Amino acid sequence: MAKVSAKYEAMYIIDKDLGEEGIAAVVERFKNLIEANGTIDEHEEWGVRKLAYLINDKPEGYYVLVKFTSAPSFPAELDRIFRITDGVMRSLITVID
């Protein structure tokens, strides 16, 4: 029997050069997208942190961690949207047991 929903964790890094308003807009966009396709269990904004290595010649990024529950098909779509969104430097989605 197929799973109806599963728990996931998404971490994404936003380019801090977008400024406060730009970062807030990106965070709000993904919050709304996840809420429209599931439920947010936990949302943490870690703020600006030093990157382990340069990404696009930038030493820092704005980190956001979201734990959510959704249908198993949604994370693939979320990952696609992370990849095409300007300002998102890196993202990772994992399944939580």
Segments from the language model and where they lie:
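Structured, basic alpha/beta domains of bacterial-type, RNA-associated proteins
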Residues: 2-97
